[in-house]
Design a protein with these regions (language model features):
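Non-catalytic cap/lid and distal C-terminal segments of serine-dependent acyl enzymes
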Residues: 1-259
C-alpha cells in the first residue's frame, strides 16, 4: 500500500473550498473541488467524533494535492455527523443505535440538502459512501438499506452490526447471510465493496471474520468485494487517511458500470 507523500501534508495552492450546510437542527461540511464534478463521496466519522473529524488540514491538504496532481479526479466530499445535537452518550452501544437510524436521515435530509445545494443530480454510480470505525458500521447499514442510492461502499475498520454490536465477529455467518438477503431484497443491483483494515487494528478480528464469511457467497459478492489488510495498520485517523489515499482514486473508475 502506498504511503502519502510528505509534500501532501502541506497546503496546496490549488485548494478546494469547505462549506457548512445546515439541515434541521444539524449541520455538515462539504468539500467542493475547484472544478465542478459529477462524483460525490459521503464520508462518515468514527465513534465520539463529528463532522470535523475528517475535515482537518492533514486530510484536506492531501485531497487538494491528489486532485491538483491528477492522482484523483475532482469530487465532492460530504462529512456529516450521525449523533443528534443533544446526544451526550457516545459509547459504542449508543453509537450503534445512532448509526442504525442514520441511513434514514441520509436519504431524507442529507442527500437532498447537499445535492440540491450543489445543483447536480448524482446517480448511484457516481455516489459513494465510506466511513471509519463506527462510520464503517454506518457504511454497512447503507449497504443493507440503500443500494438504490450508492454503488460504491468503502467501509474502513468497521464491521457490520446488523446482528448486534461487533456482530461481524460474533456472528460472521449470520451477518453474511443478512447481507446476501439485503442484496436480493433490494433487487440485486450491481455494486462494489472495498474493505480496508490493519492487522493491528482493534476492528480486525471482527471484520476479518465477517469478510471470510462473505467470501463463501461468490455468486453474490465475488469480484464485487475487495478486501485489503495493511500489515501493522492500527485504529487511528492517520492510518485511515492512508487507506483513503489509496482507495479514493479507484472509486468511480469502472466505465462499464450500470446505474
Amino acid at each position: 500500500m502506498l504511503t502519502i507523500p510528505q509534500e501532501y501534508t502541506t497546503k496546496c495552492e490549488s485548494a478546494g473550498t469547505v462549506s457548512t450546510l445546515s439541515y434541521g437542527e444539524k449541520s455538515l461540511l462539504l468539500y467542493s473541488p475547484i472544478e465542478p464534478s459529477d462524483r460525490i463521496l459521503y464520508l462518515i466519522h468514527g465513534g465520539s467524533g463529528d463532522q470535523h473529524s475528517f475535515f482537518c488540514p492533514e486530510f484536506l491538504n492531501m485531497v487538494d494535492h491528489m486532485i491538483d496532481n491528477g492522482v484523483l479526479e475532482p469530487l465532492y466530499i460530504v462529512s456529516p455527523c450521525f449523533y443528534d445535537p443533544a446526544e451526550k452518550d457516545k459509547t459504542p452501544s449508543s453509537s450503534g443505535i445512532a448509526v442504525k437510524k442514520f441511513c434514514k436521515e441520509l436519504r431524507e435530509q442529507i442527500i437532498p440538502s447537499v445535492e440540491g445545494y450543489i445543483g447536480v443530480s448524482f446517480s448511484r454510480k457516481t455516489r459513494a459512501i465510506s466511513g471509519f470505525s463506527m462510520g464503517g458500521v454506518t457504511t454497512w447499514y447503507a449497504f443493507l438499506q440503500a443500494l438504490d442510492l450508492f454503488y460504491w461502499f468503502l467501509p474502513l475498520s468497521g464491521d457490520c452490526w446488523v446482528c448486534g454490536e461487533t456482530g461481524g465477529g460474533k456472528y460472521p455467518e449470520k451477518t453474511a447471510t443478512e447481507l446476501v438477503s439485503a442484496v436480493s431484497r433490494q433487487g440485486s443491483p450491481d455494486f462494489r465493496i472495498h474493505v480496508i483494515t490493519g492487522s493491528k487494528d482493534i476492528a480486525f478480528p471482527n471484520l476479518d471474520a465477517q469478510i471470510k464469511a462473505m467470501e463463501k457467497y461468490p455468486a453474490v459478492f465475488g469480484e464485487k468485494l475487495n478486501y485489503e489488510v495493511l500489515e501493522g495498520g492500527v485504529h487511528d485517523y492517520e492510518t485511515i487517511f492512508r487507506y483513503l489515499f489509496n482507495a479514493m482514486p479507484v472509486l468511480f473508475s469502472k466505465p462499464e458500470i450500470q446505474a
